[in-house]
């Protein structure tokens, strides 16, 4: 029986990411590039990962760090959402990638941005939701139940203490 693709597409590797790994030009969507890059991590294909970064990223200079990230024990990929960007040459893919390290399971969540240039899709950058600050839970309270301490930051967003601003 043929091996299933590491990207979790439920297709065989030969009919899925191997096509992209053989020739970058075979990638036709940002999601396909993201899945093939994940599979390249699983399979240890450092060159493919480096070559599918956008040239402006100078990934060759970061080859050692990329190789280290590939050494993780990648377990599972979940594509959360794929969407078109501001035009047909930009796309975003949000995903969860699970890996084991030092006997613990971790989940990396990223919203990756891809751009198409000269007919080829490239990874250019990504944002990590855990890097974004958590919203203040008081912002979700109804006005009637809002409790603000006198020394808390003002709810108007001025940065002043509540007692010196709107309090």
UniProtKB/Swiss-Prot annotation:
Superkingdom field: Bacteria
InterPro entries reported for this sequence: NTF2-like_dom_sf, SEC_C_motif, UPF0225, YchJ-like_M
Pfam family, one: YchJ_M-like
Family, similarity comment: Belongs to the UPF0225 family.
Identification of the protein by name: UPF0225 protein VV1_2912
């Amino acid at each position: 029986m043929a091996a299933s693709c590491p990207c979790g597409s439920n297709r065989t590797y030969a009919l899925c990411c191997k096509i992209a790994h053989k020739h970058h030009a075979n990638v036709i969507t940002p999601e396909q590039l993201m899945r093939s890059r994940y599979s390249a991590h699983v399979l240890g294909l450092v060159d493919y990962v480096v070559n599918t970064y956008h040239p402006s990223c100078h990934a060759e200079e970061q080859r050692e760090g990329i190789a280290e990230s590939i050494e993780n024990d990648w377990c599972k990929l979940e594509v959360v959402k794929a969407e078109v960007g501001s035009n047909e040459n930009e796309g975003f893919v949000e995903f969860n990638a699970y890996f084991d390290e030092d006997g613990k399971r971790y989940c990396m969540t990223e919203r990756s941005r891809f751009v198409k240039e000269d007919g080829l899709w490239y990874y250019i950058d990504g944002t990590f939701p855990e890097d974004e600050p958590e919203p203040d839970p008081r912002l979700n309270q109804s006005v009637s139940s809002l409790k603000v301490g006198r020394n808390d930051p003002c709810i108007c967003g001025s940065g002043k203490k509540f007692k010196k601003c709107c309090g």
